[in-house]
Amino acid sequence: MVQSDTSKSPPVAAVAQESQMELLESAAPAGALGAQSYGKGARRKNRFKGSDGSTSSDTTSNSFVRQGSADSYTSRPSDSDVSLEEDREAVRREAERQAQAQLEKAKTKPVAFAVRTNVRYSAAQEDDVPVPGMAISFEAKDFLHVKEKFNNDWWIGRLVKEGCEIGFIPSPVKLENMRLQHEQRAKQGKFYSSKSGGNSSSSLGDIVPSSRKSTPPSSAIDIDATGLDAEENDIPANHRSPKPSANSVTSPHSKEKRMPFFKKTEHTPPYDVVPSMRPVVLVGPSLKGYEVTDMMQKALFDFLKHRFEGRISITRVTADISLAKRSVLNNPSKHAIIERSNTRSSLAEVQSEIERIFELARTLQLVVLDADTINHPAQLSKTSLAPIIVYVKISSPKVLQRLIKSRGKSQAKHLNVQMVAADKLAQCPPQESFDVILDENQLEDACEHLADYLEAYWKATHPPSGNLPNPLLSRTLASSTLPLSPTLASNSQGSQGDQRPDRSAPRSASQAEEEPCLEPVKKSQHRSSSATHQNHRSGTGRGLSRQETFDSETQESRDSAYVEPKEDYSHEHVDRYVPHREHNHREETHSSNGHRHRESRHRSRDMGRDQDHNECIKQRSRHKSKDRYCDKEGEVISKRRNEAGEWNRDVYIRQ
């Protein structure tokens, strides 16, 4: 066999290499079979040997190495790939620039609506924000002002806190997608729970706070849900244990407990739509409708009216707005039950009041509700109003008792009812039930406490970058002063048509008081009317003016409240301001006497010419006094409007 191979006379180097391989093969304990197989392999190799001694297999491996080198096609991107990557980067930068421009424009836009959050969101976890770093983080029960919709996943708005700027807010669709992704990751983590229980529990713990379970209990449904939180947190601990028996034992119990929990939270949205400005509601020290409570709250209303003049709307609500629960308004099957119950307010009336409160809040003015039926914070906890609850508290029951008894026998006979109501308010958890607690002994201190809170809230809702005239304010005030019929509109297009904005604007009273300061002559003529008006205002106990309240139950009566005084302005003006006309007449008589004296001094002149001259002067003075009266007529009318719209204190304090 060897002689037949060597007969081909291979080169010397190849023979030496082959002899070394044969020695190595013979040293291995392979036996005769191994030597025989090697001989066959040697013959197969020698068939593909080249002239330089290299085999064909070597050349093949070398070609493979050269294909995998850095010069190959696969390791170096082509020109088309580079251009595609550059196009994507350019598109991304352009989209980011447009998003930044839209964000800047939204700073000057009015607030479209407001929401209260039911979930926690951390912006650090997101990388698909339209403008990197401009997403807004928030906790549960925070409030957001939404300016506009950017796309399906993002809104543009801001967190209602002082110092927070505008940014991107995740939409409910995006939050729902995030929740589904977290659930999928949690399910995938269960496969590795038997090996690494600690890791799966920590990742699940990161998911849970951002889910709906972080919502503080604000209703009976939420209280039940959070009551099941502890049970559910204990049950997954057994699920994560490596013992298989624990799963079989606790799974029926866990299904029974977790089914109602997931059923309740399944319909809980991430956001609740609330008024753009949270309405302020006063409760305490006892029941409304009794003199002690009404007297103390009335003092606070008067203080707020003058402290925040031009920035506040105080409105009286007679409907039972505690019926405006989200579960009732969103469920038509419950409407019949409410209608059949012995409530003094229908659902249509309640819905109308809620819409009116939302409309008032769109102006971004402070909204204060004088709600007759609200005596406890739980009455509004399930509604969509999200009010600022102010608790007027008398710490000592004995002091409250003495106050009630001091109001007379008619109030003292209802002492027990008022004391029970005060005790129920005192039992409420203060941090969860009330936003402000006024427990000061002096009225001035309590007023300043409330004013400080509302000033901070005003700054939180009115950032410096967005302090521009609100078109919704003028639109709402203009719509509230529209007459009901065309005849009234035609009657009001005269001199009173110019005064319509002054009546609706909150600054009308101050403007009416500043107008006499412009011309001293006008002020001297109408000093008696100003004194009479001020005396009347002080006699009414600084009542709330109707221009800041909508104190009737239906929309028609609210509109008529703005129109009815307009019909009687001419008669009221004639009856009340007769002294002005007498004052002007005396002035006119005095001027005519002066002309007669001048006529006697110049009697030597032509009598006909003097008489013509005197007639011209008389007509001019009469015309001037008439114009002066017309100028003051607007002021007189505006004062009369404020006077006619003020509430009588005896009527306000309900017996």
Curated annotation (Swiss-Prot):
Function of the molecule: Beta subunit of voltage-dependent calcium channels which contributes to the function of the calcium channel by increasing peak calcium current. Plays a role in shifting voltage dependencies of activation and inactivation of the channel. May modulate G protein inhibition. May contribute to beta-adrenergic augmentation of Ca(2+) influx in cardiomyocytes, thereby regulating increases in heart rate and contractile force. Involved in membrane targeting of the alpha-1 subunit CACNA1C.
Subunit annotation: Component of a calcium channel complex consisting of a pore-forming alpha subunit (CACNA1S) and the ancillary subunits CACNB1 or CACNB2, CACNG1 and CACNA2D1. The channel complex contains alpha, beta, gamma and delta subunits in a 1:1:1:1 ratio, i.e. it contains either CACNB1 or CACNB2. Interacts with CACNA1C. Interacts with RRAD; interaction may be involved in beta-adrenergic regulation of heart rate and contractile force. Interaction with RRAD regulates the trafficking of CACNA1C to the cell membrane. Interacts with TMIGD2. Interacts with CAMK2D. Interacts with CBARP. Interacts with CAMK2A.
GO biological process, one term: regulation of heart rate by cardiac conduction
PANTHER family: VOLTAGE-DEPENDENT CALCIUM CHANNEL BETA SUBUNIT
Gene: Cacnb2
Stated family: Belongs to the calcium channel beta subunit family.
InterPro entries the record matches: CAB1-4_N_A-dom (IPR046937), CACNB2_SH3 (IPR035605), GK/Ca_channel_bsu (IPR008145), P-loop_NTPase (IPR027417), SH3-like_dom_sf (IPR036028), SH3_domain (IPR001452), VDCC_L_b2su (IPR005444), VDCC_L_bsu (IPR000584)
Basic residues bias locations: 593-604
Provenance organism: Mus musculus (Mouse)
Phosphothreonine: modified positions: T549
Biased composition, class Polar residues, residue ranges: 62-81
Alphabetized UniProt keyword annotations: Calcium, Calcium channel, Calcium transport, Cell membrane, Ion channel, Ion transport, Membrane, Phosphoprotein, SH3 domain, Transport, Voltage-gated channel
Site (Required for CaMK2D-binding): L544
Organism domain of life: Eukaryota
Topology with respect to the bilayer: Peripheral membrane protein
The protein, known as: Voltage-dependent L-type calcium channel subunit beta-2
Subcellular location: Cell membrane, Sarcolemma
The keyword Glycoprotein belongs to this UniProt entry's keyword annotation: no
